[in-house]
Amino acid sequence: MKSIWFHFQGYRDLPDDFTEKYDSVWVTPPNDVLCDPEMAGKYFNWNLEELEYADEMGFDGLGVNEHHSNAYGFSCSPNLVAMPLARRKSQAAIVVLGATLPLYNPAIRVAEEFALLDCVSGGRLVAGFPVGSAMDTVGVYGTPPTMVRPRYYEAHDLITQAWTRPGPFAFNGEYNKLRYVNPWPKPLQTPHPPIWLAGGGSIETWKFATDNNYTYNYLSFTGYQNSRALMQGYW
């Protein structure tokens, strides 16, 4: 068994009466009132130090993720957090769970940044491809709900082709129309870094994981017993 130190990177100084005053920690908590930029900078540095300490303690992987307008996980760009971890002399995997694919237009940006992380880390990247929460994709970035899955599948195809096909080549999708797909560099790992799918139990995501032989990561917010029952359905 392997252990990953996953850091949600929450804002650590919400008021005691937060739940009485505000509806949610996601999308709507007012940034002028609740988020001190100076403290946010300190928190990010503390978060990196904690991840580095987990590396020193021998964890098999260091996990980061992406959320937006979110007080309990305010890392809006996981690759920025992953890069200083990637350059450390370490055996720990850099587990980015992940880049919310429907938000990237064009999605070649994910292919480029993940490839660079893989090269800098010496081939330690685990590439997470979550569909994303409705709060991120619809609430913050304004993606129409009916387009979230189609954008996700097309982004997946573009990224994996960019990693495995000789460039340059053209990609003519519905949402990504690129005359030249030719990322410099391609990933160090061949044919590409391991791809993990993080999800909350959607059968569509399960099927996509099994169809492509990807690792599935269940995001448990309801405790062990509920998670165990749900995952038995997957297995």
Regions found by a protein language model. Name each.
Residues M1-R88, P193:
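N-terminal beta1-alpha1-beta2 module of alpha/beta enzyme domains
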Residues G201-W235:
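A conserved active-site cap/scaffold subdomain adjacent to cofactor or substrate pockets
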Residues E50, V81-L85, V110-F114, A155, ...:
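A general structural detector for well-ordered alpha-helical segments in enzyme core domains, enriched
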Residues M1-K2, G58-G61, K89-I94, V120-L125, ...:
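Short, well-ordered coil/turn segments that N-cap beta-strands
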Residues K42-Y53, E113, G199-K207:
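Short, acidic/polar
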Residues K2-A40, L103-A170, Y216-Y218, T222-N226:
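Flexible, glycine-rich active-site loops centered on histidine and acidic residues
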Residues E52-E56, A82-Q91, F114, D118-L125, ...:
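Acidic (Asp/Glu)-rich catalytic clusters
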Residues P150-P187, P191-A198, F208:
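Extended catalytic-interface subdomain
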